[in-house]
Amino acid sequence: GGADMLDVNMGVPLTDEPALLAEAIKLVQSLTDLPICIDSSVVEALDAGLAVYEGKALINSMTGEDDRMEAILPLVKKYNAAIIALPNDETGIPMTAPERMVIVDKIVKAVEKAGVPLEDLVIDPLAMTVGADPEAVKNTLETIHQIKEKYGLNMSIGGSNVSFGLPNRHALNSSFIAMAIAAGLTSAIMDARTPSVVEAVRASDLLIGNDAWGGNWITRFREAKNA
């Protein structure tokens, strides 16, 4: 197991979030070489965190709202960072893939206008709990497929959102991750301590051709057997 990137968020009420986030990032970087996802809804905190970060950061996140893009994209450009963007705007969260794609188109245009390379854009196609909407996962998978076909962008998603409020969440999360990878998902925010989810990711990578000749799969199997 193990994470490939760490998300750092210091959104604690009634605190100096910019100062806290900057200190947290420096502390985390003193402990690990893993890349960091700088997570805040406060623009000043993002600026403070990016200013002390050593390396190429990933910002989590911005929406398709005009004022959010106008505030955050200059920071993305200034610090040569990457950005996670969500296809929702002032009207709320679109429920269908075509509605989400309208906002994805808007985000792509804004990113290009800001001079940020599209390879630095990561779209969150929005995963909602299937416990509240039986069509939720189908809409998310269709959004992933359309983003892949139209733009070929990197994508990340909350891997456990689909199972919220339901029993046996690990089984649902593992199945969803496998389906999403097949549709074109390239990364996910997930619990790297859950063996079934990690195994679903590794197996999916092998089965869709991301793990040539099963090198990673075989290596991990041997490591587990010899542990």
Task: For the regions a language model picked out, list residue spans one by one.
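Active-site-proximal flexible loops/turns
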Residues: 14-16, 46, 67, 131, ...
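Glycine-rich, proline-tolerant flexible connector loops at the mouths of alpha/beta enzymes
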Residues: 2-34, 127-137
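Catalytic alpha/beta core domains of metabolic enzymes, predominantly
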Residues: 78-225
